[in-house]
Amino acid sequence: MAEEAGARQLNLQVGSSETDAAAREGLLSKTAATSAVAKFSNQNKRFKANATMALVIAGYMTLFGLPVFSENCAVALFGQKDSVVDDELVSVCGPNMMGMKVNIGEDDHHIELVNINSTLIADGYEPYAWCGFLPGSYFGMWPTVVQTAMFTVFGTTGSTMKNAWQCVSGTFFAVLNLYFMTFLFPKGADSDNYHPAIAWADLTFVLFLFLASRADVNTMMMGMCSTVCLMLHFMNPNTGPTIGTYKSKIPFLCWDGETTMVMLTNVMGCIIAVMATIFPKPRMNITHVHDDALEIVHGIDMIFKDCIEYYCGKARDPRRFQIFGKMAALSSAMSRISGNLEASYWETFNLGKFAKIRELYAAFNTAMKNTEDVLYSIKSALLQLDFNEHHLEFVEALGGPMEELRVETLDCLTRCANFCKDGQISPEEKEEIKKSVQKMLDKQQVLAQAFKKVAGKSKQYISQDIAPDSLFNFAISQWAKELQDWAEDLADFESKWRRKACCDAETNVFAIAASQFKSLFELSNMFSQQSLIFFLMNAIPILVGYAIAMFASGSVFVQYSSTIPATLALLVSYESGATFFTNLQKLMGVTFGHTLPLLVMSMIEFFPCDSYVRFLLHGTSIFVFYAAFTFVYYASEQWATIGIMIGAFGCGTLFRPCENHVELSAAAYAGHYKDIA
């Protein structure tokens, strides 16, 4: 009889084991299927967002490129370059002219253009030529605008605005340095008191300021790139500092000056980048913050519900790994809301109600980070859980109170997250929060009494047998306590906000700029060993490239061409741990960026400049080119570097206007091949 009973018991255990195994396999299969569906849904959303953004940027680049492949647009914006008089090509508008002009020369062969005015009109002069809204010299800088836009644009408005600020500030310092050098040597290298050593020392010092201060990436890139370009022209005795002749209403600023062109083209590129994130569909970080907050609340709800259900189970099963996966996903969502909060400052500048909205969500984010810390304790408890007889006693006593506390806590959390949206806690909302907090306190008391009662049955409150149960109970209670404290602070938000100064250092944009400037140029950091190594590692290649540009002539080298040092300024590694693969990707991006557009343009050149087919083909090529490689930039983390480099360095060839003369076209192609070399 005993043997039969033992056999039956063994069969029951085997059957139970097989049943558990089957159940676990079924749960794993169901979990995998659910995960696959969720993953596909997220991938589909990301694909649509990335594709839409790529198409929008491509559309902006195509519209911006109209003056390049449309002669009418080029004349409207930059004026009439030349005209045919008696089968002879005569130059009309010079590179430094803009606006409507009259010809006070002898005839059409001897053109002398001046600005139109009432006196000339009264004398019988008629408008002769339109020289554009911008001087013709800006036409050569048109690809620079596209390159700036490509290095500036990001997935959201706030991040793009931040990049734009970095770009403009870096370029501004480069322009400021050239004005300083022009003050010392008004004619540049052709000045009587000019000495090359001073110019080299200035260049090295400016590079040191950018690199040793460890400024933001875009600040360093655009600042150093603009510096080497401006300084090369300054040190060229044939050109010197091109201050310009077409004066503006701003003192010391000429519309056709090189410093003005560099500054304005960078600003235009930044404006295009920002506009791409606003129209046709706004991609504001501040609007994502509330969605992220609700997503986090939903994730916390699922995690704590699953944790309590698993805790109240009768045996270990694979559900705990599913819970751990959700915890990891929640951490990613919390990082996202932190990034959106930081970037949203550059959209709102804490003006109006946005200061309060950001303050409320910053407090929410802090509370959620405290919750994230609690999750580590819960994970540890679930891993150690034994499901023995002591555990079953805890489940019977604590299961109900835990679930009730979870429900009340999530109800309070959801209310508070929604109350943050409008940046104001009304008296009615304050009263609701206080009622929710009181309910949480009541449920905490019930749970504490239940735990005290069941733990008292053991000889010790802390023992190996009940340690996981104690830890789990503590974590649930601590989670509720953290959110309770945050909710109480939220209820008193309005009174605290009124006591806060309206223009304190945290919300004043000028104070923030001053603080950043001070931190950048802190001497102890700039002259630290790490900063000096970083400076030498990046400045030496740029200075070597600059020396080649200064002195090398012949073969593939063009003296005083900024291609080599400017490219190095945009490509050097700003991360100390940059890998060989990353540098190889940059090299591939630059190479393909120069060669692929050449192949495209070689086909377009078969059509004459006034051909409608050429107009459509050139515009379509720009659109497809930027749609494809911008999509690579957004969609692929591995190949993003190549995508952005191809887009940024391809503009010089794609945005080349049509040349009716074979000699000019051939010279342009030769120049592009030298750039590749």
What does each model-found stretch correspond to?
Residues A2-K356, E488-A677:
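A transmembrane helix-and-boundary motif of multi-pass membrane transporters/channels
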Residues I296-I512:
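Cytosolic, long alpha-helical scaffolding segments
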